[in-house]
Structure formats: C-alpha cells, structure tokens
Amino acid sequence: MTLFHFGNCFALAYFPYFITYKCSGLSEYNAFWKCVQAGVTYLFVQLCKMLFLATFFPTWEGGIYDFIGEFMKASVDVADLIGLNLVMSRNAGKGEYKIMVAALGWATAELIMSRCIPLWVGARGIEFDWKYIQMSIDSNISLVHYIVASAQVWMITRYDLYHTFRPAVLLLMFLSVYKAFVMETFVHLFSLGSWTALLARAVVTGLLALSTLALYVAVVNVHS
C-alpha cells in the first residue's frame, strides 16, 4: 500500500513534466541540457534569495501577522524573473522554445529540490496522508506558473513590444510575483483549509495563464 501510494504521488508529480517535455517538441531540439542549465541557474538564484532573506528579514515566529514584512519578502521573487530572463537570453531560437526551456528547467529544478525528498520519505510511510497528493498536485500548478512567468518575461523584454501592451504585461508580472503572498495572506486571515487553499491557487494560476496566453497570442499576431 505504501509503495502504491508513493507510485501514485510520484507519477502525479513527475509525469506531467515528462509529458510537457515530449509534447512541447523540446525533445526534437535536443534541449535536455538547456533545461539542465536552466535548473542550475535556478539553484544559483535560490541561493542568492536565501542569503538575502536570511540577512535582511528575520523569520516570523507567530503573533501579529507582519503584512509589510511578508510583502517585502515576496518582492524577492522578482529574482526568479531575472533568472528566467537570463536563461532565455542565453538560448537562441523561437520565443516558444525559449519560454519552454526556461520554464521546464526552472520548474523541474524546484520539483527535485523541494518535493523529491518529502515524497520519498513521507509517501512511503505506514500511514496514508493526503498532503503528499496535494504536494504532487501543487507541483503541476508550479509548472504552469513558471510557463506563465517565462512568457511574461519574454514579452516584456521584446524591444519591439508595442507600448499599448506594456502596461498589461507589467500588471500580469506583478500578479505573478505577488500571487503566493496574496494566497498566503488569505489563508492566514480566513483560516482556509489545505484543499481550499490548493483549489484557490489552481484557480488563480489558471486565470493568470489564460490572461497571459491571450496577451501572448495578441503580441505574436501583431508582430508577425
């Protein structure tokens, strides 16, 4: 039973990444090592973020919720956008190729570093726990999030982007950066359950994805 539970969690977490890699055409471009390079960049960016947070922002230990402090901590996630831009700027090719390489490499590195060990240790435990199913589902939401963020970075860094599109792209980037902060605040204020919080994150990420896709199609059509 425990091995079956671990297999379900592992498949739910990792197979969407494999399917995305195969179906997006990245395998035809031999982009595996490009994705690995994106993952290495992810590790470097996360190390810089941790050092910055540990130096300038103390850990919140309960009591009154520090709204301003948590907002400032969330602002550090701008470094992810900078890292994604760095990855895309070092890859030649079409826009969708750059976006998928950066997003898939970034999301896979996060999956391995933040969820691999908890799944291996926890999902193989004696007792069944829904939190590992939730963790696996959340990894799929993260994949969509990084695809969305990469598309936004690609659009905003186009030198020929029409000025009419720029405010919309910047707004979507702002929402992507502070989405986790907003969700955490709602969970804290309204004491949302784990499934409710996961559903809310999925809905918000889906809305951002649809908005970004519509804007991406408009930008590509205008500049084609």
From Swiss-Prot:
Tissues where the protein occurs: Expressed in cerebral cortex, submandibular gland, hypothalamus, pancreas, liver, and ileum.
Record field: transmembrane:
1-21, 35-58, 67-88, 99-124, 130-155, 165-187, 195-216
Alphabetical list of InterPro entries matching this protein: TMEM147 (IPR019164)
Question: What main location does UniProt list?
Answer: endoplasmic reticulum
* Gene Ontology cellular component terms for the protein in this record: endoplasmic reticulum membrane; multi-pass translocon complex; nuclear membrane; plasma membrane
Compartments annotated for it: namely: Endoplasmic reticulum membrane; Nucleus membrane; Cell membrane
The annotated topology with respect to the bilayer is:
Multi-pass membrane protein
Q: Residue ranges, Cytoplasmic compartment?
A: 22-34, 89-98, 156-164, 217-224
Lumenal side: which ranges? Answer: 59-66, 125-129, 188-194
Q: Please name the GO terms of the biological process aspect recorded for this protein, alphabetically.
A: multi-pass transmembrane protein insertion into ER membrane; protein localization to nuclear inner membrane
One Pfam family it belongs to: DUF2053
Q: Name one GO molecular function term.
A: ribosome binding
Q: How does it assemble?
A: Component of the back of Sec61 (BOS) complex, composed of NCLN/Nicalin, NOMO (NOMO1, NOMO2 or NOMO3) and TMEM147. The BOS complex is part of the multi-pass translocon (MPT) complex, composed of three subcomplexes, the GEL complex (composed of RAB5IF/OPTI and TMCO1), the BOS complex (composed of NCLN/Nicalin, NOMO and TMEM147) and the PAT complex (composed of WDR83OS/Asterix and CCDC47). The MPT complex associates with the SEC61 complex. Interacts with CHRM3, CHRM1 and AVPR2. Interacts with LBR; promoting LBR localization to the nucleus inner membrane. Interacts with DHCR7.
| Family membership noted in the UniProt record | Belongs to the TMEM147 family.
Q: Per its record, how is this protein called by name?
A: BOS complex subunit TMEM147
Which organism does this record belong to?
Mus musculus
Q: What is the lineage of its organism?
A: Eukaryota, Metazoa, Chordata, Craniata, Vertebrata
Q: Which gene encodes it?
A: Tmem147
